[in-house]
């Protein structure tokens, strides 16, 4: 059950996209900008370009297309062009990419601006390693492509008021953080102690970097960590963490699935949060972790590169590694552990982390600036 993954997805989203534009005429509203997101809404700028740009009620609207994850492009056989999408054959070249219909590619072609969910990701998707085949479509559209980092809801994720964590705390009164750690260990069945607690809340899939985690997991335990994992996904990773829980019953806790309240307790109760992603368009977990004074250990990719400053810098908020390599990740984990035992430096780091601002305010300013530029309102 859900919004995606049905045999008739193309028809569903074609209908929705056409309905959006028809609805504007019915309610007699002409926006200056339409900002469509991902392949599910990619037909909105396409339909506008083909059918509505000369409509007396809708002419002059500018279209922004936002890519959240370029892996999901809306690819279908060419046979749906006319019957399902309702697009005349002479527009086939607009819709076609590598002998298929590609809805995301078509939106990239016709949109006035293309945005992504982080500045680094907007550059990475020009590289075949990240683009899932769309680098050719994007290479000559760089002039209209940019990236704005997403934000988080700082009211929902607020350690000072969050009712789902065992104790509240602030940047100036951190005592509740330790209570959260103690209660987390109690809830997941691990013994109390001063050892650093490493948290992970994630889908257990290859592109989240879990092959790196598998490679050096024993080494992480040997560094003295307790590890708390919440997630589900590929069977190989679920099985691995079940085995690690059995192998290290006093060091490893694994909950298969997703429990929102437990996720919050991990964000609040862990000392470090590991995100070794192979690719990460934006990522929100690292921002949430910072909010709760939990130090991110991340691979420097996509939004992780834009949001976490390595502690080699005096303004550092976490630990980063560049190469997609298990031992580079392990070294970052070791650096975090070494800092953890230097309580003066660790407290300074936690303070910097909790003061980092990843609200929507900055992102909103950037989008408003883009919209004003397109609307001619400098």
Task: Enumerate the language-model features and the residues they cover.
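Catalytic cores of nucleotide-sugar-dependent glycosyltransferases that transfer UDP/GDP/TDP-activated
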Residues: 1-378
């Amino acid at each position: 059950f859900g919004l995606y993954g049905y045999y008739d997805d193309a028809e569903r989203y074609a209908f929705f996209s056409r309905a959006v534009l028809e609805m504007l005429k019915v309610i007699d509203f002409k926006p200056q900008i339409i900002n469509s997101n991902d392949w599910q809404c990619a037909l909105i700028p396409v339909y506008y370009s083909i059918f509505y740009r000369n409509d007396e009620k809708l002419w002059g609207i500018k279209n922004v297309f936002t890519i959240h994850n370029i892996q999901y492009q809306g690819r279908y056989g060419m046979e749906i062009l006319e019957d399902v999408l309702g697009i005349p054959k002479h527009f086939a070249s607009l819709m076609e990419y590598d002998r298929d219909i590609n809805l995301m590619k078509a939106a990239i072609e016709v949109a006035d601006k293309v945005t992504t969910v982080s500045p680094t990701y907007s550059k990475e998707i020009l590289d075949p390693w990240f683009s899932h085949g769309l680098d050719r479509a994007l290479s000559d559209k760089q002039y209209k492509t940019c990236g704005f980092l997403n934000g988080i809801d700082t009211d929902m994720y607020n350690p000072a008021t969050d009712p789902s964590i065992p104790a509240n705390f602030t940047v100036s009164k951190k005592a509740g953080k330790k209570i959260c750690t103690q209660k987390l260990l109690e809830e997941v069945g691990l013994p109390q102690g001063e050892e650093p607690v490493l948290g992970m809340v994630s889908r257990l899939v290859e592109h989240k970097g879990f092959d790196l985690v598998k490679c050096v997991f024993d080494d992480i335990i040997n560094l003295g960590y307790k590890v708390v994992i919440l997630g589900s996904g590929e069977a190989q990773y679920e099985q691995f963490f079940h085995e690690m829980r059995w192998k290290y019953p006093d060091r490893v806790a694994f909950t298969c699935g997703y429990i929102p309240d437990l996720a919050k307790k991990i964000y609040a109760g862990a000392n470090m949060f590991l995100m070794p992603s192979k690719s990460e368009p934006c990522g929100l977990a690292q921002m949430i972790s910072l909010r709760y004074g939990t130090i991110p250990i991340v691979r420097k990719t996509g939004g992780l590169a834009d949001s976490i400053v390595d502690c080699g810098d005096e303004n550092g908020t976490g630990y980063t590694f560049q190469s997609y390599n298990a031992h580079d990740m392990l070294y970052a984990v070791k650096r975090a552990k070494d800092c953890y035992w230097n309580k003066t430096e660790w407290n300074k780091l936690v303070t910097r982390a909790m003061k980092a601002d990843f609200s929507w305010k900055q992102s909103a300013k950037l989008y408003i600036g883009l919209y004003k530029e397109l609307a001619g309102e400098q």
